[in-house]
A protein has these predicted regions:
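Generic signal for short, ordered secondary-structure residues
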Residues: 25-26, 57, 87-88
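Short beta-strand segments
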Residues: 21, 54-57, 93-98
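Extended, charge-rich helix/loop segments that form flexible
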Residues: 1-49
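C-terminal active-site subregion of NodB/CE4 polysaccharide deacetylases
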Residues: 15, 48, 65-146
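A short, flexible beta-alpha/helix-coil linker loop
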Residues: 59-62
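Acidic (Asp/Glu)-rich catalytic clusters
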Residues: 38-55, 110, 128-129
Length: 146
């Protein structure tokens, strides 16, 4: 999984994913996406009813695998998408894909005025912790694995 997500070039990853999709799912990417994901209209309806949508990156890349220019593009693209959903001010929040980020990510989120960043670090938030590195508990952290 990590090889596919971070080591291989985007070109090769895309080709492999398309082949896997064709061979094992037997459905084209557009149809599958439509059945799995919410439409823009559904998201807007949820927002109008008080739901908050934060960001998870535009392309769900490991941020630390991207250089500063690529991270900037990823972040500005997702801000543009969120702007197309909200018709009023909203809080920019980030839930790091795979829990992965680096100092460059934090600098860019600060530059773009993100108000919150959620990590995958399993611990309780303390008032001295960075607001862009908020730890959180996963439900899997509470129950022993059998």
């Amino acid at each position: 999984k990590r090889l596919l997500q971070t080591v291989l070039s985007l070109d090769i990853r895309t080709k492999i994913c398309r082949l896997l999709l064709e061979d094992f799912i037997n459905e084209d990417e557009k149809s599958l996406s439509k059945s799995l994901y919410m439409s823009k209209e559904q998201i807007k309806e949820m927002i109008s009813n008080g739901m908050h949508f934060g960001s998870h990156g535009k392309s769900h890349f490991w941020f630390s695998s991207l250089n500063k220019i690529e991270q900037e593009k990823e972040i500005t693209s997702l801000i543009k998408f969120l702007n197309s959903l909200y018709n009023k001010d909203y809080l920019l929040t980030m839930c790091y894909p795979y829990g992965d980020y680096n100092e460059c990510t934090l600098e860019l989120l600060t530059k773009h005025e993100f108000k919150l960043g959620l990590t995958t670090v399993p611990k309780t938030y303390n008032s001295g912790d960075s607001i862009l590195e908020v730890p959180r508990w996963d439900t899997n952290d509470y129950y022993p694995k059998k």
